[in-house]
């Protein structure tokens, strides 16, 4: 088994192996899967990190470099007649904490018939496609929770904005 514990800070121009993974698989810090060659792989990455992205490189325990490839998956490709309508669609999806890939004049999300119906009700054009999914990571670092229990554990600094010092 190819055992991987480390993400590399930069992409590498060369690699020894590839992992073709869906977005869900790239979001896990612990995963048993298979490399493109068929070799069994065990991922044991640091918890609390952003999902792996297409092109990211990992280092295996035996020194081999492994490149991550975003596997194509079934997505909804959303367009609207105006920027305002697209903004409304993004608002309603964000209100439901849906992972979104944002492009110039379009949104993409994992295929979901309930969200498709909602988007069509909002006037969006929704097309089912097969493509790699690379959603936004979000504005804040660390984990996601709504509880104030154990607040110190989850006291992550904002990545985009500094609103003030938390004590």
Curated annotation (Swiss-Prot):
Name of the featured protein: Urease accessory protein UreE
Keyword NAD: no
A Gene Ontology BP annotation from the UniProt entry: protein folding
Any Gene Ontology CC annotation: cytoplasm
Role summary: Involved in urease metallocenter assembly. Binds nickel. Probably functions as a nickel donor during metallocenter assembly.
Organism for this UniProt entry: Pseudomonas aeruginosa (strain ATCC 15692 / DSM 22644 / CIP 104116 / JCM 14847 / LMG 12228 / 1C / PRS 101 / PAO1)
Protein location: Cytoplasm
Encoding gene per record: ureE
Pfam families: UreE_C, UreE_N
Keywords: Chaperone, Cytoplasm, Nickel, Nickel insertion
Broad class of where this protein is predominantly found: cytoplasm
Protein family according to the UniProt entry: Belongs to the UreE family.
């Amino acid at each position: 088994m190819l055992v991987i514990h480390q993400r590399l800070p930069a992409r590498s121009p060369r690699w020894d192996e590839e992992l073709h993974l869906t977005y869900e698989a790239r979001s896990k810090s612990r995963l048993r899967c298979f490399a493109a060659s068929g070799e069994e792989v065990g991922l044991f990455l640091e918890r609390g990190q952003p999902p792996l992205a297409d092109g990211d490189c990992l280092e295996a325990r035996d020194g081999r470099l492994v490149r991550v490839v975003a596997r194509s998956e079934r997505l909804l490709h959303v367009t609207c007649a105006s920027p305002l309508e697209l903004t409304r669609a993004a608002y309603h999806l964000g209100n439901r904490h849906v992972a979104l890939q944002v492009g110039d004049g379009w949104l993409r999300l994992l295929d979901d018939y309930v969200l498709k119906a909602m988007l069509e009700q909002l006037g969006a054009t929704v097309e089912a496609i097969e493509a790699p999914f690379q959603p936004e990571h979000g504005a804040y670092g660390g984990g996601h929770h709504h509880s104030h229990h154990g607040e110190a554990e989850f006291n992550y600094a904002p990545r985009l904005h500094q609103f003030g010092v938390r004590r």
